[in-house]
């Protein structure tokens, strides 16, 4: 197959929205991270719930991870 016959790859996410996605995803991730820290500091060992801790930390890590991914794409580090 020749190079001219191939179709050009286009990203499923428009690069113009990388900055917006970065800010929104990182803001949501930092909110859940702060919520996790406040939960850990204000709860006693008797009132802690491991499933709530895992859920909050999982959501925070997902949003922060995708936020960092789009941050790298925004600055030109294409991974």
Curated annotation (Swiss-Prot):
Does the entry feature the keyword Endoplasmic reticulum, yes or no?
yes
The UniProt entry, under Pfam families, shows: Ost5
Q: State one molecular function term (GO).
A: oligosaccharyltransferase complex binding
InterPro entries attached to this UniProt entry: TMEM258/Ost5
> What are the TM regions of this chain, as residue ranges?
17-37, 59-79
Q: What does the entry give for GO biological process?
A: epithelial cell apoptotic process; inflammatory response; protein N-linked glycosylation; response to endoplasmic reticulum stress
| Location within or outside the cell | Membrane; Endoplasmic reticulum; Cytoplasm
> What is its membrane topology?
Multi-pass membrane protein
Presence of the UniProt keyword Zinc in the record: no
Pathway(s) of this molecule: Protein modification; protein glycosylation
Top-level taxon of origin: Eukaryota
Kindly list the positions at which N-acetylmethionine occurs in this protein. Answer: 1
What keywords were assigned to this record? Acetylation, Cytoplasm, Endoplasmic reticulum, Membrane, Transmembrane, Transmembrane helix
Q: Which GO terms describe its cellular component?
A: cytoplasm; endoplasmic reticulum membrane; membrane; oligosaccharyltransferase complex A; oligosaccharyltransferase complex B
The protein's assembly and partners? Component of the oligosaccharyltransferase (OST) complex. OST exists in two different complex forms which contain common core subunits RPN1, RPN2, OST48, OST4, DAD1 and TMEM258, either STT3A or STT3B as catalytic subunits, and form-specific accessory subunits. STT3A complex assembly occurs through the formation of 3 subcomplexes. Subcomplex 1 contains RPN1 and TMEM258, subcomplex 2 contains the STT3A-specific subunits STT3A, DC2/OSTC, and KCP2 as well as the core subunit OST4, and subcomplex 3 contains RPN2, DAD1, and OST48.
Q: What does this protein do?
A: Subunit of the oligosaccharyl transferase (OST) complex that catalyzes the initial transfer of a defined glycan (Glc(3)Man(9)GlcNAc(2) in eukaryotes) from the lipid carrier dolichol-pyrophosphate to an asparagine residue within an Asn-X-Ser/Thr consensus motif in nascent polypeptide chains, the first step in protein N-glycosylation. N-glycosylation occurs cotranslationally and the complex associates with the Sec61 complex at the channel-forming translocon complex that mediates protein translocation across the endoplasmic reticulum (ER). All subunits are required for a maximal enzyme activity.
Q: Describe the family membership recorded for this protein in Swiss-Prot or TrEMBL.
A: Belongs to the OST5 family.
For this protein, the record's PANTHER family field holds: TRANSMEMBRANE PROTEIN 258 (PTHR13636)
- What is this protein called in UniProt? Dolichyl-diphosphooligosaccharide--protein glycosyltransferase subunit TMEM258
Q: What organism is listed for this UniProt entry?
A: Bos taurus (Bovine)
């Amino acid at each position: 197959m020749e190079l001219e016959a191939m179709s050009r790859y286009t990203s499923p996410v428009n690069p113009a929205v990388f900055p917006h996605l970065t800010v929104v995803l990182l803001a949501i991730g930092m909110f859940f991270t702060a919520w996790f820290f406040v939960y850990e500091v204000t709860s006693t060992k008797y009132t802690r719930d491991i499933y709530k801790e895992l859920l909050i930390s999982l959501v925070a890590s997902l949003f922060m991870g995708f936020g960092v991914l789009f941050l790298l794409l925004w600055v030109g580090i294409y991974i």
